[in-house]
């Protein structure tokens, strides 16, 4: 009777120890970040932002011009948000489309803070600067016909948003 009891306990202990042994003997570090969180871009590509465009136009642009992003969500029905992400955690682009006609009216691009200089310089070259607060990373730009407003906002120490909004 005692031998069966000890055998059961020994088997249970072996089952509990096996995952620890295999995990500790592996070369992978489970606490290691996937990818380099400080990946700096050489060239920043703007997300698709032609207001009034449809979902298919956005998907086509993303597939051709922004290959580091992959589509992760699409909701249909009354509201059609379209979400793309990179493999780098919180980087991504959220597209919002109108319930009435399915046209694009808002884009939110989340980028790493390490790339803020590259992004801000690009926006300064291609749009009219309306206001700037470098300390808080809040910039406001507009396009030539003032039909769109582009704003930037710090969302954390490691990320910031670039928002494209249609002006009605």
Functional labels for PLM-detected ranges:
Residues 13-19:
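Sec-dependent N-terminal signal peptides of Gram-positive bacterial secreted proteins and lipoproteins
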Residues 20-24:
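C-terminal motif of bacterial Sec signal peptides marking the signal peptidase cleavage site
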Residues 73-76, 121-146:
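Short Gly/Thr-rich strand-loop-strand
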């Amino acid at each position: 009777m005692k031998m069966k009891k000890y055998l059961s306990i020994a088997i249970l202990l072996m089952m509990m120890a096996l995952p620890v042994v295999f995990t500790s003997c592996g070369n992978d570090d489970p606490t290691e970040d996937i990818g380099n969180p400080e990946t700096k871009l050489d060239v920043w590509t703007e997300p698709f932002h032609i207001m009034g465009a449809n979902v298919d136009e956005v998907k086509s642009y993303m597939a051709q011009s922004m290959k580091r992003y992959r589509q992760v969500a699409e909701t249909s029905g009354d509201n059609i948000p379209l979400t793309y992400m990179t493999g780098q955690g919180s980087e991504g682009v959220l597209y919002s489309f109108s319930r009435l006609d399915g046209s694009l009216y808002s884009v939110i691009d989340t980028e790493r803070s390490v790339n803020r200089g590259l992004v801000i310089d690009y926006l300064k070259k291609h749009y009219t600067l309306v206001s700037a607060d470098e300390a808080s990373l809040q910039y406001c730009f507009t396009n030539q016909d003032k039909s769109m407003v582009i704003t930037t906002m710090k969302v954390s120490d490691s990320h910031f948003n670039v928002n494209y909004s249609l002006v009605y």
